[in-house]
Structures are given as structure tokens and as C-alpha cells.
Amino acid sequence: MADTYRTERDSLGEMKVPAEARYGPQTQRAVENFPISGQRFSRRFIQAMGLIKKSAAETNLELGNLDPGIAKAIIAAAGEVADGAWDEEFVLDIYQTGSGTSTNMNTNEVVAHRATELLEDAGSVHPNDHVNFGQSSNDTIPTAIHISTRIAIEEELIPALQHMHDALAEKATEFDGVLKSGRTHLMDATPVRLGQEFSGYATQIRKGIERVRLVAAELEELALGGTATGTGINTHEDFSRHTIAKIALATGISFCEADDHFEAQGAKDAAVNAAGALNTIATSFMKIADDIRWLGSGPTSGLHEICLLYTSPSPRDRG
């Protein structure tokens, strides 16, 4: 059993780490300290962390903060992390220390280990002194939250919502000539066209997209550069501006430095606002689904105004 582990040392002492792992003692301590949910960070979040470390190393190389060989090795290793080459090395539970220090160090250790491999015998890369140079968990983790969420909104959520909107709008046109009873509190009311009801559903989704775009703009403000407490202590005055410009270039999204680092790090109001927009969209989904279910109820004792295709056997078809 001893052959499957290696012993590493950090400020708290010795720690046994799986022999083949590219993470180090701080990650292993977090594995043992926080075995809470079994849920790990998403690919999007790991991608964002890799992008931050790569962009930071590029800036530190330009500013002369790191040895060129070490900086280039970090750039290559962090690029591999961003591309998904080492996702299995990100072993931590999403529930951990409030600042996300464990995941920041997981990233630093994986990048440092891989960068040292790339250097072969030409040097050694330290997770704190080199990979995390000019950064803190308190600004990198909030930055990764914004980057990963903003990219997911752009690449996944909005296209899916647009597809749903287009399908509902198409049905609104198709059903425009279908006359039915309107209802208030389920009681018959003045006539409406089925297409009009579906146009309302399509508009709900369109407005949901508009709301998401508004909150997405807030997520483009990044906390990077505030370091530990928002003051920017121990980092170069040009570090955040240059690094965020690189992140914006790599993603094609207009990321910028937060105008107030104390707000950006002391609160997550932009993320809460985004969650609110998602909650509104989910509520729209529930409303639409409930209406369609009600319209399709029956066929003998419900409304049965529309026919829904079976997606699974009905209980009455069994036995």
C-alpha cells in the first residue's frame, strides 16, 4: 500500500498523496477535510481556472515577474488544464472553504506539477510562488465564477432558449386559425386562438433571453487584481488589466476589471442577479408545461383540446 503514495510536505507538515496524482498536499488535505456531497466542479469552471492561470503567467512573463522558462511552462500546463487534459486531477467537493482556497490550490498544484514535468530537469515550478503569482483565492475564484457562468450563458443557455422560442413561435403560427375557449380561473371566458396562447409562451422565452443578456453583462466585470482583500496588495499595478485583456481575447467576451474590488470580492450580487434570471426562466417553463399538460388532459374527462404524443407507456396501458 505504501508504494501507491508519495509523501509531500507543506506548512502544516507531511502529507501522503496518491503517487500518480498531479495535485499536492493542500489538495489532499481538502479531500480529507471536505468529503461532503461527492459533487465536483464543472468542466466550465476548471476551464476558467486554467484560463486565468495561463493568462496570469503570460502577463507575469511580459512584466518580468517570472523567469521566462518557468512562465512558458506554466502557460503550456495551464493551457492543458483549460483544454480539459487534466480534469481527473480536480478531485475536490464543491462544498469546501468559503473562499475556494482549496480549488485554487488544486489548480496551482496541478499546473505546477505539470509545468515541472514539461521543464524536465531545467527547473521546478512552485504552486504559490510561481503559478499563483500576483493572485489570491479571493480574487481568482470570484473571477472563475463569472467567467464560467458568462461562457455557459453564451454558448449553452441562450442557444437552447432561442431554439425553444423558435419552436413555440412556429407553433403559434401553425395554430393561429384554431379557435378555443379562453379561461379565467379555469372557467370558460371569451374565445381566443390557440396560436395566441402559444405566442404568449414564445414571448415568455424571448423576454427570458433578454433578461439573461442583461445579467450576463454584469458578469463581465472580474474581481481579478484585488488579491486577498480588494486592495490589490502584492500585485503589479498593470497585472489585472493585462491579464483580463488576455482573457477577453481568448473568450471573445468583453471582460473587464471590476470598478470596485471591495464589491466584487465582498459580495456576489451579479451572480445572485443571474440566478434570479434563471429562476424566472424556470418559472416560465413550469407555467408553459402546466398549461400544455392541462390542455392535453383527458381524453374522456379532461379538456383534451390538444393531443400530446405518449413518451412512455400510460399506467392504464399496463396489466
Model-assigned labels for residue ranges:
Residues 94, 304-306:
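Long, charged, glycine-rich C-terminal linkers/tails
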Residues 20-22, 28, 110-112, 279, ...:
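Short, glycine-/Ser/Thr-/acidic-enriched flexible segments
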Residues 310-319:
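Conserved small/polar residues in nucleotide/adenosyl-binding loops
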Residues 2-226, 236-250, 316:
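A helix-coil-helix interface module used to build multimeric assemblies
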Residues 230-304:
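Acidic, glycine-rich loop-and-beta core segments that form the ion-binding/anion-interacting portion
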